[in-house]
């Protein structure tokens, strides 16, 4: 990169660095975006860069493919209802093992001492009840997010890395959809921005054609996209969570391609951003 290009890059980024300094960013890192170790390391390095620039970063992660692999090893089939994993008692044990154990600790290790691994059960962080609007087994609906642990870690410039296993008032563990958990955590923290890093470039009119990316969606358009089938399956909890977050005070919410190197830095610090931005009319 030439010196002139470098200068222009920093010139473009400067107002965004000022904008987000001291603000809270909640990132949901989807399991489908964790395509290889090299890319995961690059993403974690970008998160460290954000903290060095004064952004308060909270990482909420999924781990669907790793859970699917473990279920396959024990001879269990993965089943989904409206984008949510059916979770019987045996599956719940596997979810805990994979999310709070394997995936969480792998990400913390890549942060090289700047991350602290947490589970939603720690410190009564994610309190929930059994989701009752469908037969999903041990899938939880969040009742309350306690941010005490998160606040302490952010104050000391650590990155909380949160596995989305919550519990009810009796200590029974529940599988929580990571998109839903990220949105609720963003709301509870009064976050400036919620970013979902996934394995697609954003919301597509045609899921098989990346050129049909929808760069911006106003909240009133969401129901129409649902009716058209543009928002369906795993996109439902993702976008419903983002819409709820915006309605409850989170300023910005965006879906970006977590497989693209440095996509989170591009989204945060460039004029063109990345992916699909969700917004509320009058709140831009």
Each PLM stretch: what is its role?
Residues 1-259, 266, 272, 279-284:
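Nucleotide/pyrophosphate-binding catalytic subdomain
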């Amino acid at each position: 990169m030439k010196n002139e290009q470098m200068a222009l890059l920093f010139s473009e980024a400067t107002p965004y660095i000022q904008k987000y300094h001291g603000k809270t960013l909640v990132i949901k890192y989807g399991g489908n975006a964790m395509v290889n170790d090299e890319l995961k390391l690059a993403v974690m390095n970008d998160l460290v860069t954000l903290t060095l620039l004064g952004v308060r970063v909270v990482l909420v992660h999924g781990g669907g493919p790793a859970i699917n692999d473990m279920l396959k090893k024990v001879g269990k089939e993965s089943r989904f209802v409206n984008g949510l994993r059916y979770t019987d008692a045996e599956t719940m044990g596997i979810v805990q093992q994979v999310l709070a154990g394997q995936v969480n600790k792998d990400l913390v290790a890549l942060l090289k001492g700047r991350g602290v691994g947490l589970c939603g059960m720690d410190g009564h962080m994610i309190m929930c009840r059994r989701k009752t609007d469908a037969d999903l087994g041990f899938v939880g609906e969040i009742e309350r997010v306690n941010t005490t642990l998160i606040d302490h870690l952010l104050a000391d410039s650590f990155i909380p890395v949160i596995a989305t296993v919550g519990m009810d008032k009796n200590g029974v563990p529940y599988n929580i959809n990571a998109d839903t958990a990220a949105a609720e955590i963003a709301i509870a923290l009064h976050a400036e921005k919620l970013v979902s890093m996934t394995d697609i470039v954003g919301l597509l009119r045609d899921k098989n054609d990346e050129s049909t990316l929808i760069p911006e969606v106003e909240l009133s358009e969401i129901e129409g996209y649902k009716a058209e089938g543009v928002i369906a399956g795993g996109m439902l909890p993702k976008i419903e969570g983002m819409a709820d977050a915006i309605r409850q005070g989170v300023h910005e919410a965006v879906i970006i391609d977590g497989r693209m190197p440095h996509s989170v830095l591009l989204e945060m610090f460039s004029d063109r951003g990345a992916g699909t931005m969700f917004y509320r009319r009058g709140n831009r």
